């Protein structure tokens, strides 16, 4: 039988579902992130994008956790505004409206924690984004658990980011509303404060999460967790999110072809 990382990587490309045997389940977060990294290596080149999840009470409840989690987005699953995004029907698909923040300077590994002020200075742009989440595991997101979901790419299916807004620092992201539409009807709304109180707090968490390993590099973009909750979607759906002065983003879902 193929290793768990090989099976998870294959499932992202084939639409299959994976059963994790008891003897290969990650026993802690460190083991889960190790599997996640192996999956990324198998899939190949990563994008310059990160996703952070479980930044809202709803998302944490769904995964059975009390803290965020992160994953780098593989290049083949990173999209831009207006994209046709291929998805598999068995992967328990949901969409979230999220603020994406871009880093303007390197934030290298170091012993001292990064402060909120340092991160605020380092961010050089904000963009609307849609993250599509799901599970390659039998039972879906709700039954996967934190460790298994982390191993499975942090539940990421695809990330779609919009136009970067550079002149944004006079905007309070915590009170900025996001309206999520499914097939031209608003189905969910929320404020930036759903993401750890403020999307900037999410970026601070990620910088400190990565300061003992890779750090963050200038030009990388980070989706900061759902402001709209999770909305069930499937192939054929049209999705749009309106972030007010920050802009809009849209995507439509199509049936994936097995790779």
Question: What would you call each of these model-derived segments?
Answer:
Residues 2-198, 213, 234, 238, ...:
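Catalytic-core "active-site belt" of small-molecule-metabolizing enzymes
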Residues 202-231:
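A conserved acidic, glycine/proline-rich C-terminal tail/linker
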Residues 226-227, 233-241:
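Low-complexity, intrinsically disordered Gly/Pro/Thr-rich segments
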Residues 244-246:
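Beta-strand-rich extracellular modules
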């Amino acid at each position: 039988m193929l290793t768990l990382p090989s099976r998870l990587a294959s499932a992202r490309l084939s639409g299959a579902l994976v059963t994790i045997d008891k003897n290969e389940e990650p026993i802690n977060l460190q083991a889960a992130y190790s599997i996640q990294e192996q999956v990324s290596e198998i899939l190949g080149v990563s994008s310059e994008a990160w996703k952070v999840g479980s930044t809202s009470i709803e998302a944490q409840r769904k995964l059975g956790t009390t803290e965020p989690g992160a994953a780098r987005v593989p290049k083949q699953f990173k999209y831009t505004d207006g994209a046709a995004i291929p998805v598999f029907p068995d992967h328990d698909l949901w969409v979230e409206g999220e603020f994406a923040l871009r880093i303007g300077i390197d934030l290298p590994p170091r012993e001292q924690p990064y402060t909120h002020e340092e991160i605020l200075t380092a961010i050089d742009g904000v963009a609307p984004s849609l993250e599509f989440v799901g599970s390659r595991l039998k039972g879906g997101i709700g039954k996967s658990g934190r460790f298994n979901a982390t191993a499975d790419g942090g539940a990421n299916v695809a990330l779609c980011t919009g136009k970067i807004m550079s002149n944004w620092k006079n905007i309070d992201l915590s009170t900025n509303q996001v309206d999520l539409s499914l097939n031209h009807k608003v189905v969910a709304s929320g404020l930036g404060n759903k993401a750890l109180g403020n999307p900037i707090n999410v970026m601070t968490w990620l910088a400190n999460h990565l300061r003992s390993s890779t750090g963050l590099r200038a030009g990388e973009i980070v989706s900061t967790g759902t402001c709209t909750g999770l909305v069930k979607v499937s192939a054929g759906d049209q999705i749009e999110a309106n972030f007010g002065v920050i802009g809009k983003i849209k995507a439509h879902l199509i049936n994936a072809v097995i790779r």
